[in-house]
């Protein structure tokens, strides 16, 4: 199992798919990383040499991923809540932020229905 940015990358998958298991790396960034390092995106992780894995680790280290990114996102949400702006209030009330209707939908965001007795 290859370990990149503190995450075990699945060895049986292609490198592009394996990189996407790291929080903060999506399809575009995974393909860009392969292009920068001149790796074939269809290469399986198990077939990649250790020196190439070191190059991948160095490239991924340039990005903000995993714990740092999660911390930044949570701090951004906390800042919105502290400001008391519309988005912060919606976060605080666990309601949709971007103008979706809430009369009939938004069950995922609101949580299960509360029983009225």
UniProtKB/Swiss-Prot annotation:
The gene is rpsM. This is Small ribosomal subunit protein uS13. It comes from Ruthia magnifica subsp. Calyptogena magnifica. InterPro entries: Rbsml_uS13_C, Ribosomal_uS13, Ribosomal_uS13-like_H2TH, Ribosomal_uS13_bac-type, Ribosomal_uS13_CS. HAMAP family: Ribosomal_uS13. PROSITE patterns: RIBOSOMAL_S13_1, RIBOSOMAL_S13_2. GO terms for molecular function: rRNA binding; structural constituent of ribosome; tRNA binding. Part of the 30S ribosomal subunit. Forms a loose heterodimer with protein S19. Forms two bridges to the 50S subunit in the 70S ribosome. Located at the top of the head of the 30S subunit, it contacts several helices of the 16S rRNA. In the 70S ribosome it contacts the 23S rRNA (bridge B1a) and protein L5 of the 50S subunit (bridge B1b), connecting the 2 subunits; these bridges are implicated in subunit movement. Contacts the tRNAs in the A and P-sites.
